[in-house]
Amino acid sequence: MRDRVTFCIKTIHRPHCCANLVRSIYEHCGDDRPLIYVLDDGKPELRFSQVCPDEAAMVDRLIETEYDIGLSAGRNRLVEAAQTRVVIFSDDDHVVGPQTRLNDLVRKFESSRLDLLATLSKQPHRPNPDGTPRLLNSSGGVLHIPRGEYRRIGDIAECAFVCNCFVAYRDILQAIRWDEDLKVDEHWDFFWRAKIAGVRVGVAMDHVFPHIHVDPPAYKRHRPVFLRAALRKHGLRKVLWK
């Protein structure tokens, strides 16, 4: 896959999580693994390269920026840095596991009609996975994000909103981009704009990224601040997940 796919990881203050993800790519993909690019905007003492130097040496490119450029800016820089037609994204507290079947996921994506294909995300202590397909609709100043899908083709559910573990065409991500002003409340904004632009999205229901959640130490997300900014941007009053 190294000639056509780049696995992009944005990380801050979770070096051991990032190390687990990098090792899992090697373990489950072997020599047929994608290129691995990591962008780290953490404080110097919590950098991936400082805390986990062995795993940092395993990546193909490590980009270290000034402190806290934000999730959105980090993802945009990774997309700009990658040279392959296809990129994979997942949060740094996920890993590739037996049910991820990353190589099969990429092949399935490349043979589909989609621009972005996500997987499910599963925390070990929860009975059901996250990331099931959702739709996006706006009415009366409210953005609704209910569970649902447009159609099912094989194990792929075509929809409008998915989780943060996905494979996509790089030029599509370059065209939509994540809003850097929204930092950590970027997700629904990205997929709302993607829907308006006609991006074709789906979930491969037979593929799962294990999710080992860890809160980053010494980092405040300030998510309510960015949620208010996102609502103002779209002229909305609230978001309902139903």
Regions found by a protein language model. Give the residues of each.
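Short, well-formed alpha-helical segments that are part of the catalytic scaffolds
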Residues: 14-28
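Acidic donor-binding segment of Leloir-type glycosyltransferases
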Residues: 25-64
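Glycine-rich, basic loop-to-helix element that forms the pyrophosphate-binding segment
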Residues: 66-82
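Short aromatic/hydrophobic "clamp" motif used to bind/position activated sugar donors
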Residues: 87
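Conserved donor NDP-sugar-binding/catalytic core segment of glycosyltransferases
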Residues: 100-136
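A recurrent flexible, glycine/aromatic-enriched loop bordering the glycosyltransferase active site
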Residues: 147-168
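Acidic donor-binding loop at a coil-to-helix junction in glycosyltransferase catalytic cores
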Residues: 184-190
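Active-site donor/metal-binding and catalytic loop motifs
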Residues: 204-222
